Amino acid sequence: MIISVMSKDRPGIIADVTGAIYELNGDLADLNQTVLCGYLTMILIATFDSSVTPEDVIAKLSHTKSDIKFDAIVKRMDTPIEILKAQVPEKTYILTAHGKNKKGLVFGISSFCYQRGINILDLTTTLADNKYTMILQLDLSHITSIKNVREDLAAFAKEAGLAVVLQHNDIFRVTNEVTMK
């Protein structure tokens, strides 16, 4: 199942959510969590016995003992996790873009991608000191010419006032990955 949670941030939300999954004998596969302007959002993938329904998960989550409640959505996944994990696109690229903050930057870059059939797999943005930074993980599987994308991206970046770097995911990982030994 895929589980999405949002709440005003407080200590213990992750323990509450993962505890509810554990109490239902669920196995947590993946989790992505962030706090943005005082609100926590989390998306999780967990497997359960076939008798556990999305409604069971919602019921368990709703019985969390806290003054600050959270909103949750639970859906069954169409494809088993093992199959999804094996399907990482070979032509995955990382696009970093930064420039002076102004309205429409995310709309502009997401429209650029959409118009070319580029799927955004992951997007993170940060605003600090009036500078806006975007990091996008892109699936370029349907692109026949990376050179054309780079040329179009350079023109877009110039018009938008952004500095951009597009590199293959493997190169990005090698140069930016932190390993734990």
PLM features: what roles do these ranges have?
Residues 1-181:
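A conserved regulatory-domain signal marking ACT and ACT-like small-molecule sensing domains
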